[in-house]
UniProtKB/Swiss-Prot annotation:
Cross-referenced Pfam families: Ank (PF00023), Ank_2 (PF12796)
Role summary: Substrate-recognition component of a Cul2-RING (CRL2) E3 ubiquitin-protein ligase complex of the DesCEND (destruction via C-end degrons) pathway, which recognizes a C-degron located at the extreme C terminus of target proteins, leading to their ubiquitination and degradation. The C-degron recognized by the DesCEND pathway is usually a motif of less than ten residues and can be present in full-length proteins, truncated proteins or proteolytically cleaved forms.
InterPro entries: Ankyrin_rpt, Ankyrin_rpt-contain_sf, TPR-like_helical_dom_sf
Species in which this protein is naturally found: Danio rerio (Zebrafish)
UniProt xrefs under Gene3D superfamilies: Ankyrin repeat-containing domain, Tetratricopeptide repeat domain
Protein name stated in the entry: Protein fem-1 homolog A
Assembly: Component of a CRL2 E3 ubiquitin-protein ligase complex, also named ECS (Elongin BC-CUL2/5-SOCS-box protein) complex.
ANK repeats: 2-32, 40-70, 82-111, 115-144, 148-177, 181-210, 213-242, 482-524, 528-557
Length: 617
């Protein structure tokens, strides 16, 4: 173990004497350098502050000259916080003496993490009231929000820390501040069920605002199922009759899908219906005219009278469809919960073996997501992955003869086409290109869908449609992590891992062959100058290499490390393969390699075509 790791471990474990022994013979400059050396992403001072080792903190600051503001990586509850200053770590962990020591040595009180979280916000998160008081006394800014626009007051409300929320309000925290998504501290109370804090906020003139999804705190409480908040707010004079009706209807839907309490749902739906028809026909607030019937909902219609509502009791499945209809009407298709619970209901059907209902619901949710979310949204990616996992499960069990259900070409092809459309949307959005991890996941899921599609028998028209869709993908020239093309990914073992459950197995000769037949560039290069042939070789796949060579792959092209695919295969398989280099090497290749090996000048002396050929080697 090197000395920097030993110093870090001593700081982490609070072993002051060991640290002194390690550093006693070092010069001041060496001690300062070791105090700022990062191990596992963090400095000795950061890790000592995290675990509250005050003597070690004093030693590092006073004897080693440690930088009191230098941030790093630190772990809390299994999550790595990047760019966390020592003061943030001590505040989050609740170590008041360390907080005092760091501030006495000049730690900036508003120094933030990479996500713009302040030490004050960290203390508010975990309910450390004394630290909150101390930081505010030392000029901590109450209004510095994190990258999501979430303030100290908001997180105190969400976590239910009443005394901290009260203290912040007394110190003048903005009660109506909005986050990036438009939610206020009242929304956080509603989502967490913090009724007493909500009452405090309302006494401080908090306003019932709508967030970016059009949600009021009342609706937010209905979505999360906090009946105490709903009951309090529906009796407030500021809630209109229509708002009360919507809140009770939505709470009923939450009882169906989240709490799985159908009788409880009926109680709230009855109350909503009574409110709708209060005052008789003349004063009724009827539901809006229903749109077209939705096959995914089994063509169910929302009930509009008390008689129709009571008839639901005999049909639990119809009640579940009512919950989906109610949620879509009130929240709208853009709200994440609308598509989430449609997918949830589909998953319940799948668990009971009703795959047809599941697929219908999931397709409807996917269309909703693609119409309302950004391209390659994590929610949409999750939907595509769920389809791939479901199709894989059905195909495997059908092959074993344990399942009567089957996957149709139309279902699988429909999802594949939508997934390629998602990539097309992302590529078209040039001003906001997708993040590489999102793009990589999307391409990986598409390859898994192709893997499954290759297992189905296809007629000529179906084969044409499949190839047409693959061509649409290849035409975009999409690149995953490391510059991998779909062909690189098809011959890479790492593509196998896409979710929690197995789907396809890679490298896949079937998928690679399909991509080649549809025009994939067999000599395309990734960012390390690897061709698909290099990747296949590194994965020990001579059969796939042979297919690539038949498709025109250049056998002895070199990558950035000046390695050929054959050299990678030799290293991977220790010569246990039937691929013979002389069968694929031309005299022209040997000449090009000789020019490269002897560094002979050639640029400007031969044709551009010949120059490009030599550069391959």
């Amino acid at each position: 173990m090197d000395i920097s790791a030993a110093v870090f471990n001593a700081a982490r474990d609070g072993k002051l004497k060991l640290m002194q022994k390690l550093l006693i013979n070092k010069s001041p400059e060496e001690r300062a350098a070791l105090a700022e050396e990062r191990t596992e992403g963090g400095t000795p001072l950061l890790i000592a502050a995290r675990y509250g080792h005050l003597p070690v903190v004093h030693f590092l600051l006073e004897r080693c000259g440690a930088n009191v503001a230098l941030g790093g990586s630190v772990n809390f509850d299994g999550e790595t916080i990047e760019g966390a200053p020592p003061l943030w770590a001590a505040s989050a962990a609740g170590h008041l003496p360390v907080v005092k020591a760091l501030l006495e040595h000049g730690a900036p009180v508003n120094n933030t993490t990479l996500t713009n979280s302040t030490p004050l916000r960290a203390a508010c998160f975990d309910g450390h009231l004394e630290i909150v008081r101390y930081l505010v006394e030392h000029q901590a800014d109450l209004e510095v929000a994190n990258r999501h626009g979430h303030t100290c007051l908001m997180i105190s409300c969400y976590k239910g820390h009443r005394e901290i929320a009260q203290f912040l309000l007394e110190k003048g925290a903005d009660v109506n501040r909005k986050s990036v998504k438009g939610n206020t501290a009242l929304h956080d109370c509603a989502e967490s069920g913090s009724l007493e804090i909500m009452k405090m906020l309302l006494k401080c003139d908090a306003r019932m605002e709508r967030d970016g999804y059009g949600m009021t705190p009342l609706l937010a409480a209905s979505v999360t199922g906090h009946t105490n908040i709903v009951e309090f707010l529906v009796h407030q004079p500021r809630a209109s009759r229509e708002q009360r009706i919507h809140a009770l209807e939505l709470l009923g839907a939450t009882f169906v899908d989240k709490k799985r309490d159908l009788l409880g749902a009926m109680r709230y739906w009855r109350r909503a219906m009574e409110l709708r028809w209060a005052g008789g026909q003349a004063g009724a607030l009827e539901k809006p005219t229903a749109g077209p019937l939705v096959p995914a909902y089994d063509c169910s219609r929302e009930v509009s009278t008390a008689e129709e509502l009571e008839a639901l009791i005999t049909d639990p499945d119809d009640m579940r469809m009512q919950a989906l209809l109610v949620r879509e009407r009130i929240l709208g298709p853009a709200h994440p919960d609308t598509s989430y619970y449609i997918r949830y209901r589909g998953a319940v059907y799948a668990d009971s073996g009703n795959f047809e209902r599941c697929i219908r619901l999931w397709k409807y949710a996917l269309d909703m997501q693609q119409s309302n979310l950004e391209p390659l949204s994590p929610m949409t990616a999750s939907s595509f992955l769920s389809f791939a996992e479901l199709f894989s499960f059905v195909l495997q069990d059908r092959a074993k003869g344990t399942l009567a259900a089957r996957v149709s070409f139309q279902d699988l092809m429909g999802v594949l086409s939508k997934s390629v459309r998602e990539v097309e949307r992302a590529v078209a959005q040039r001003e906001r290109p997708p993040e590489p991890p999102q793009f990589s996941k999307a391409l990986s899921i598409i390859l898994h869908l192709l893997f499954l599609l290759q297992k189905l028998r296809c007629g000529p028209e179906q084969e044409h449609l499949k190839r047409q869709t693959v061509y649409r993908l290849l035409k975009l020239n999409p690149r995953a992590r490391g510059g991998h093309t779909p062909l690189h990914m098809a011959v890479d073992r790492d593509t196998t891992s896409v979710g929690r459950y197995p789907v396809g197995r890679f490298p896949s000769l079937a998928v690679a062959s399909l991509l080649l037949e549809c025009g994939a560039d067999v000599d395309s290069r990734d960012y390390d100058n690897n061709t698909p042939l290099h990747i296949a070789a590194a994965n020990g796949c001579p059969d796939i290499m042979a297919a690539l060579i038949r498709a025109g792959a250049h056998f002895d092209a070199t990558n950035a490390a000046q390695q050929t695919a054959y050299q990678l295969l030799e290293a991977q398989s220790s010569g246990r393969h039937a691929l013979h280099p002389l069968n694929h090497t031309t005299l022209q290749c040997l000449a090009a390699r000789a020019v490269t090996a002897h560094r002979l000048p050639y640029k400007g002396l031969i044709s551009e075509q010949m120059e490009a050929f030599i550069e391959l080697h």
